[in-house]
Amino acid sequence: MPSMTKRKFKEELLQALAPEIYGPSDNLTKRDIKHVKKREKKEEEVAAASADGVEFVRSFAPRRRVQWKGRQVKRILRPGTTVVFSPGERTIMRPLKREYDEVYADDDILEQAAQQTGEFAYGKKGRYGDKIAIPLDEGNPTPSLKAVTLQQVLPVLGPSEEKRGIKREAMDELQPTMQLMVPKRQKLEDVLEHMKVDPSVQPDVKVRPIKKVAPGLGVQTVDIQIPVQTALGETMEIQTSPIKTTVNASVQTDPWYPPVLSTKKKRHYRQTSSLLPDYVLHPSIVPTPGYRGTTFQRRATAPSRRRGPSRRRRRRKATLAPAAVRRVVQRGRTLILPSVRYHPSIL
């Protein structure tokens, strides 16, 4: 330790030359630090055991927190693995001996590989998995055109959003689709080979009304007609209108009869208010003339024989005067209404 020795020499020389600067300080007070002895856990266990009066005869081995038994694998041969057994020969090359998990596997190993579960649940995966896009409308509002491509999602994101990626919330939302259509009367090869688009000509945009496909959900189709020119300079036919058929002028020799229309008689139903039911009145009620309704009369079930005077005394029925009625003409109809006497308190 030469460096340490030189340092000691320098300190001694400096203390001898300038003791007021390099001398030891006089007011060095040594602090009294109290060392706390850490109480061991064994002492607490011994104290608790002595307090409970339980004596442990044997010392137990330290237990693991998780009792891991390992991967339970059935002895099912892994698909594509060849096993060669030649009795009497020993494997000379130990590194060539395959491991147990390499030869045998679970019975659903192919399903695990397809679903990326079990021993295949490692590595990088897609953020969203395989998303299935379903077009909401496959109708063709232009019958003269035929679809060449399927409906593809229209990229409407900006360049910065494309770098960062699509947001997680935007995957479940609706996205616009695009589909290329060509005229039916032209061959697809002619359209693709002799197609020439002039960027100076603005395309014709036609916005169609919203088509309802589900409750609270609609699809709006926007037709963008791009004018296309051939190599010869002629404008190609984009959408052909149906050709009008000519009507042949001919003479009809058979006589023409007007069609006979069978008319059914219309049934007329009377007003419900004018229909009165058949009803039976109580014997104490005098029927009003002009209205339906009869007084209730008891049917004679057996021929009554004339007997002598009965002991029961019957009261004589008072002869009621006929009801006073009055005729009222209302809307050309004559109504027979009973005359009513009001209470003196009623005006």
UniProtKB/Swiss-Prot annotation:
Family in the record: Belongs to the adenoviridae core-capsid bridging protein family.
Transmembrane regions listed in the UniProt entry: none
Function field: Associates loosely with the viral DNA to form an outer shell around the nucleoprotein-DNA complex and links it with the capsid by binding the endosome lysis protein. Dissociates from the viral genome during entry. Might be involved in nuclear capsid assembly of the viral particles through its association with NPM1/nucleophosmin.
GO biological process: viral release from host cell
Extent of Basic residues compositional bias: 304-318
Cell location: Virion; Host nucleus, Host nucleolus
Cellular component GO terms held in the UniProt record: host cell nucleolus; virion component
Description of how the protein assembles with itself and partners: Monomer. Homodimer. Exists in equilibrium between monomers and dimers in solution. Interacts with the histone-like nucleoprotein; this interactions bridge the virus core to the capsid. Interacts with core protein X; this interactions bridge the virus core to the capsid. Interacts with the endosome lysis protein VI; this interactions bridge the virus core to the capsid. Interacts with the peripentonal hexons. Interacts with host NPM1; this interaction might play a role in virus assembly.
Record's keyword terms, sorted: DNA-binding, Host nucleus, Late protein, Viral capsid assembly, Viral release from host cell, Virion
Induction entry: Expressed in the late phase of the viral replicative cycle.
Identification of the protein by name: Core-capsid bridging protein
Positions in coiled-coil regions: none
A Pfam family the protein falls into: Adeno_PV
Annotated region described as Disordered, given as residue ranges: 290-320
HAMAP family: ADV_CORE5 (MF_04053)
Main location: virion
Other facts noted in the record for this chain: All late proteins expressed from the major late promoter are produced by alternative splicing and alternative polyadenylation of the same gene giving rise to non-overlapping ORFs. A leader sequence is present in the N-terminus of all these mRNAs and is recognized by the viral shutoff protein to provide expression although conventional translation via ribosome scanning from the cap has been shut off in the host cell. This protein is only encoded by mastadenoviruses, and may therefore play a role in mammals tropism.
Gene name for this UniProt entry: L2
GO molecular function: DNA binding
Listed InterPro entries: Adeno_V (IPR005608)
